[in-house]
Amino acid sequence: MSKLVWDKTGERLYETGVKQGVLYVQDAQGAYPKGAAWNGLTTVTESPSGAEATPLYADDIKYLNLMSTEELGGTIEAYTYPDEWAECDGSAAIATGVYIGQQPRKTFGMCYRTTLGNDVENNAYGYKLHLIYGALAAPSEKAYATINDSPEAITFSWEFSTTPVNVEGFKPTANIVIDSTKVEPEKLAALEAVLYGDAETEARLPLPDEVVQILAA
């Protein structure tokens, strides 16, 4: 038995930042076969909803709580976006460099990375990979303003909802988080080779069951 100790050296952890965003447009088979680097990504906000309790009463007492299904939505903010995003945002090319709106929106997945730090190694402690599946972007406002003496770049913003995908042995999910401080480096490198591509293969987003296979190999 040992007494609990708070704020030990090396255990004062924090999470910060967002970088290395990748967009994966879903194909007709439900796979995410090709990734595109998302430059200018500034914010990804994950906003779970649901999981609300509905109380049931019997015998003049609270009998139990029924929980509603939890869903994942969120917001993406960026200064720019890859060309592949157009079809996820309801646009279609009718000629080179010419786009029309109000078109069907494609489902997408994405990957982004956040930084893990502590009181010893600061931001070099580690990172988390966030994988999102079955996302669908909603129409969003774009505000264009004149250039003035306080110039600002336009920040684009999109809200998204998700449809979970199957995971063997668990309920369907729309997101996976991988912690680099807890996964073997060789297995993490193998997963990143799939997510980001390499000299021989295109970047793609593996489905959850394949992620498990890679990290459990």
For every predicted segment, state its role.
Residues 62-138:
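Structured, beta-strand-rich domain cores
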Residues 1-46:
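Polar/acidic, low-complexity leader/linker segments enriched in S/T/G and N/D
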Residues 2-9, 23-29, 78, 88-94, ...:
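Short, charge-rich amphipathic segments
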Residues 139-142, 146-217:
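Mixed-charge, glycine-accented linear interaction segment located at domain edges/termini
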Residues 46-48, 56-85, 150-165:
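Oligomerization/assembly interface segments of phage tail-like spikes and tubes
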Residues 43-50, 132:
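Membrane-targeting and insertion segments and their boundary/processing signals
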Residues 42-46, 62-63, 138-145:
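Short amphipathic beta-strand and strand-loop transition segments with alternating hydrophobic
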Residues 1-5, 65, 217:
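Structured catalytic/translocation cores of nucleotide/phosphate-coupled proteins
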